[in-house]
């Protein structure tokens, strides 16, 4: 099965320098992939000219005259910039010309435009943002929602769990993923009313519901999936990113303190590199916008060429394994339970 990916080539902090270069790398590894690069043709061609091995027969350049900036209000991105690279890329999925779209652009705008153009799956009240967070087991804990829905009702959280359950099966190959509900304690008596009601509803489904989990369980890998509302999820995500940057800076500072500590760093380089690889956030790049009638992947705005490649990987696996169709089918089954 051939897979076509539409890329918002202008999105993110680095634009075409990252997106187009990463696309060329990806095409070299996947002979069954075609890519549509959406944006300024002149800028796109400049980068392509530096990649002589790029299989041009599998690359399509689509003109888009506008760009959604990272600080653009959602209203501007949605109503005024109707020829933005982000919007035109999403329209490729809507029209069936692409199987998935990837953008490093403004998250709020991406969700709003995707929801406006693609619409939500039947029965889905609200789309959610899901991504993997590094854990000590060496694989990611899938967490959602990460900011799309600050306030949620119990049934919204149940729907998030249902959609993530299929996504983890499709993208990560975990056939019966365990699901945890983020709470202030494992006991069923703890938490607010929304969490308590959600827990009860999840126990009534056919999902592999583990029960309540705490914040530290995310990084332990206690469950494959952790569900929470978007307010809590975004706080957890930003806090974990901040902690990782702080620890990295402190370690670098300590090893550069003196000649002796620099020598110690040389001696410890192998285990340090192993640890860095296991927690490298770039390897977990590519959040999925779940609940839409199309596959939409959000890459981190600051993603480099290496990180953007992982977002393309995620889009490829989701599209190849028909994630959206399988979520729609499984969702209907679960909602009948």
UniProtKB/Swiss-Prot annotation:
Keywords: Cytoplasm, Lipid biosynthesis, Lipid metabolism, Phospholipid biosynthesis, Phospholipid metabolism, Transferase. The keyword Lipid metabolism applies. Pathway: Lipid metabolism; phospholipid metabolism. The keyword Transmembrane does not apply. GO terms for biological process: fatty acid biosynthetic process; phospholipid biosynthetic process. GO terms for molecular function: phosphate:acyl-[acyl carrier protein] acyltransferase activity. Transmembrane segments: none annotated. InterPro entries: FA_synthesis, Phospholipid_synth_PlsX-like. Its EC number is 2.3.1.274. Gene3D superfamilies: Isopropylmalate Dehydrogenase. It is found in: Cytoplasm. It catalyses: a fatty acyl-[ACP] + phosphate = an acyl phosphate + holo-[ACP]. GO terms for cellular component: cytoplasm. PANTHER family: FATTY ACID/PHOSPHOLIPID SYNTHESIS PROTEIN PLSX, PHOSPHATE ACYLTRANSFERASE. Catalyzes the reversible formation of acyl-phosphate (acyl-PO(4)) from acyl-[acyl-carrier-protein] (acyl-ACP). This enzyme utilizes acyl-ACP as fatty acyl donor, but not acyl-CoA. NCBIfam families: plsX. Homodimer. Probably interacts with PlsY. Belongs to the PlsX family. This is Phosphate acyltransferase.
């Amino acid at each position: 099965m051939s897979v076509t990916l539409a890329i918002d080539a202008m999105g993110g902090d680095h634009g075409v320098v990252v997106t187009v270069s990463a696309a060329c790398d990806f095409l070299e590894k996947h002979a069954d992939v075609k890519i549509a690069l959406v944006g300024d043709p002149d800028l796109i061609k400049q980068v392509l000219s530096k990649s002589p091995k790029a299989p041009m027969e599998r690359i399509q350049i689509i003109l888009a005259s506008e760009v959604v900036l990272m600080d653009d209000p959602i209203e501007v991105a949605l109503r005024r910039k109707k020829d933005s690279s982000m919007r035109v890329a999403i329209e490729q999925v809507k029209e069936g010309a692409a199987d998935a779209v990837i953008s490093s652009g403004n998250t709020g705008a991406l969700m709003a435009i995707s929801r406006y153009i693609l619409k939500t799956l039947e029965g889905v009240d609200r789309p959610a943002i899901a991504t993997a967070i590094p854990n000590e087991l060496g694989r990611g804990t899938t967490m959602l929602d990460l900011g799309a829905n600050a306030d949620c009702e119990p049934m919204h959280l149940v729907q998030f769990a249902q959609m993530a359950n299929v996504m983890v099966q499709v993208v990560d190959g975990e056939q019966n993923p365990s699901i945890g509900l983020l709470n202030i304690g494992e006991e069923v008596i703890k938490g607010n009313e929304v969490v308590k009601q959600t827990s009860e509803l999840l126990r009534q489904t056919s999902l592999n519901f583990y029960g309540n989990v705490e914040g530290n369980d995310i990084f332990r890998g206690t469950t494959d999936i952790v569900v929470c509302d978007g307010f809590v999820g975004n706080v957890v995500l930003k806090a974990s990113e901040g902690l990782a940057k702080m620890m990295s800076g402190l370690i670098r500072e300590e090893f550069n303190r003196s000649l002796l500590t620099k020598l110690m760093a040389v001696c410890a380089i192998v285990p340090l590199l192993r640890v860095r690889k296991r927690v490298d956030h770039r390897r977990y790049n590519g959040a999925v916008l779940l609940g839409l009638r199309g596959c939409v992947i959000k890459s981190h705005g600051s993603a480099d060429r290496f990180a953007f490649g992982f977002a393309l990987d995620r889009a490829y696996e989701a599209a190849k394994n028909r994630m959206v169709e399988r979520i729609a089918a499984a969702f209907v089954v679960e909602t009948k339970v």
